[in-house]
């Protein structure tokens, strides 16, 4: 559920930067320059700060369509499964239908090998590493403005009217890629450095997880294909929690608003302490729906035997 209709204070700088990059990319004045910038960008930040919602606002501001694919659900070319389409086919079809596209690859950090936290791009054992390699390869080719070898256009009347050369031009000139991720394992590693021994105190002098720190830990192949200046969102502030709760309440049906407001008042302090982000709203909505359901339920006859 997206409850943002305008950016929160902590999101404004990041949103403005995404919009500026996307508009400059679409303008195309860079194409004839001897040095071509890397426009595709990475957005990072803790869970629940509105990274994906930010992409939706950016798409609206730049008159772009929004295509979002979650990296863990990416289906590589050739991995045919009944009822599941290859992600490349979905992307090609979307591009064929739209003039401009902001393409969000969500949970990019899930594509990292287990050893990639150090920036080495090391590999992990097991079959999942093979899947990650295929998906990373396809994403790298898209970021380079190429389709994976052997790709076929969707068997669709509209797509049959556009050639592979035309859809490649659109990929290179009208598709702005945003890689989104929490990179939570790096935050966890940083926050849990301890000296040897049980019960040791946390190190009070840990480095801050800035955008530069995250960028320095990216596998080189990934870093080479995206803008080196990562866009980082900070944690939600207490005032942000209250604002998004108010915005969410206004969008709910009238019969749920009072119960939702009550749940927010019970949970918001714990949500702020635990840094749950907008996820705490889901808990409040679920409890409000449960309350409504219980209020409408027909009481059970105590004389019934089961």
Task: State what each model feature region is.
Residues 44, 53-56, 109-110, 115, ...:
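Canonical AAA+ ATPase core
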Residues 66-101:
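Short glycine-rich substrate-engagement loop in P-loop NTPases that contacts/grips substrate
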Residues 2-40:
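Pre-Walker A (pre-P-loop) alpha-helix and adjacent loop at the N terminus of AAA/AAA+ ATPase modules
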Residues 47-49, 61, 72-76, 108-111, ...:
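Conserved nucleotide-binding/hydrolysis micro-motifs of P-loop NTPases
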Residues 37-69:
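Walker A/P-loop
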Residues 25-38, 149-169, 256-263:
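Short helix/loop segment immediately N-terminal to the Walker
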